[in-house]
């Protein structure tokens, strides 16, 4: 889904620039996925349900963000959740009755279980629930799905409430700035059907446009570094040097592997009919996306993992048309993404101009801190370590190597 949206009019099409430590094969520019749809990235992401590490929340609270300790935010996670496997995961960490459906994918291919077996053979711990008390290891995670169907934030929250009199959703609209009067946010300006419009509020404005668009809107609204705003011809409402700075994001490196597997195509007409009728079978899963690793590098402890491995592929291919068609080669492809969870490198979001429709300048500055690269290499080696197990040798899991 993410690859389908990328490059289309359903994507913001963000690109970083002037990268000195990464993105060498693309002239110092890397793409940043962001869905331009109602529901945002929950419409195209991998649906994996991970709340984040409690230490992260406690660290944010220690920075002065009142109300953000793990003990303070946990009740809101529980309030949001409708866990379809509550008897398995327990009510201390999970709950039912909320708007967001959470459960494992109904279908996992045999290779997914083989990966867990390989993880054990490689010496990694197995976690039954990364949202519980075992925060590191390999595990089969829950997802934001219900009966094999994606549940985006729009489907979970907006669709059930769309007939409420106090809810108005403006589609095909782009917010261009927050309106500030006498030091208070009183509304927003937005563009729709070829014209700028304004909506006002009597209470508050909540800006929740993501880690790129939120600072972009603030800068366009005159909130940010004074010198930068003045250079763009924008009236300064509030001189806040921090707006747009301290940018950081998860860095990942994708490894492609081939495996020899003579199974039949999963995505055939029989699978389609099963999914349409019962929301079960191969199409109710997401390949090996349900297998995730949260690992601790040599620079941290198991209760605060700084590396992640998430997996893509295995059953993405489709049959030629006839039911039960066999693969011609028996060779499949899987991707293991090694992720840096707590990067120290910092970049910046800034304006290219005062035109709200011109993309902001994104300088991620990823891998500028040597320790980030060290940890990323550890994550890559952890992924490769899986191949040196009996469970993966049975699949002849082989790293694809492309000469530079």
Residue ranges with predicted function:
Residues 1-404:
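N-terminal redox-cofactor-binding region of secreted/periplasmic oxidoreductases
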């Amino acid at each position: 889904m993410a690859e389908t949206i990328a490059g289309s009019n359903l994507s913001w099409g963000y690109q970083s620039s002037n990268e000195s430590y990464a993105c060498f094969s693309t002239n110092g520019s890397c793409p940043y996925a962001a869905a331009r749809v109602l529901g945002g990235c929950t419409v195209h992401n991998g649906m994996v349900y991970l709340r984040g590490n409690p230490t992260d929340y406690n660290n944010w609270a220690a920075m002065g963000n009142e109300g953000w300790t793990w003990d303070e935010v946990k009740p809101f996670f529980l309030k949001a959740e409708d866990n379809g496997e509550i008897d398995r995961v327990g009510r201390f960490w999970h709950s039912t009755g909320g708007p967001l459906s959470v459960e494992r994918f109904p279908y996992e291919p045999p290779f997914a279980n083989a990966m867990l077996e390989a993880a054990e053979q490689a010496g990694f711990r197995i976690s039954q629930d990364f949202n519980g008390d075992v925060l590191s290891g390999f595990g089969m995670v829950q997802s934001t799905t219900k009966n094999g169907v994606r549940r985006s934030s729009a489907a979970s929250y907006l669709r059930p409430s769309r007939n409420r009199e106090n809810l108005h959703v403006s589609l095909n609209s782009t917010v261009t700035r927050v309106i500030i009067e006498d030091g208070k946010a009183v509304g927003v300006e937005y563009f729709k059907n070829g014209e700028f419009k304004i909506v006002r509020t009597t209470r508050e404005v909540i800006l929740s446009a993501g880690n790129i668009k939120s600072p972009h809107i603030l800068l366009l609204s005159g909130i940010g570094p004074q010198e930068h705003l003045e250079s763009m011809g924008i009236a300064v409402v509030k001189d806040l040097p921090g707006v747009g700075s301290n940018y950081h994001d998860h860095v990942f490196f994708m490894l492609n592997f081939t495996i020899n597997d003579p199974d039949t195509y999963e995505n055939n007409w029989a699978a389609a009919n099963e999914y349409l009728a019962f929301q079960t079978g191969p199409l109710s899963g997401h390949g090996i996306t349900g297998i995730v690793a949260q690992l601790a590098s040599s620079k941290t402890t198991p209760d605060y993992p700084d590396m992640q491995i998430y997996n893509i592929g295995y059953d993405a291919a489709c049959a030629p048309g006839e039911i039960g068609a066999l693969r011609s080669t028996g060779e499949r492809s899987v991707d293991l993404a090694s992720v840096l969870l707590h990067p120290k490198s910092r970049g910046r979001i800034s304006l290219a101009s005062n035109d709200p429709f011109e993309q902001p300048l994104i300088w991620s500055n990823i891998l500028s801190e040597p320790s980030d690269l060290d940890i990323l290499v550890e994550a890559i080696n952890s992924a490769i370590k899986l191949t040196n197990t009996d469970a993966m040798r049975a699949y002849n899991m082989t790293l694809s190597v492309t000469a530079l």
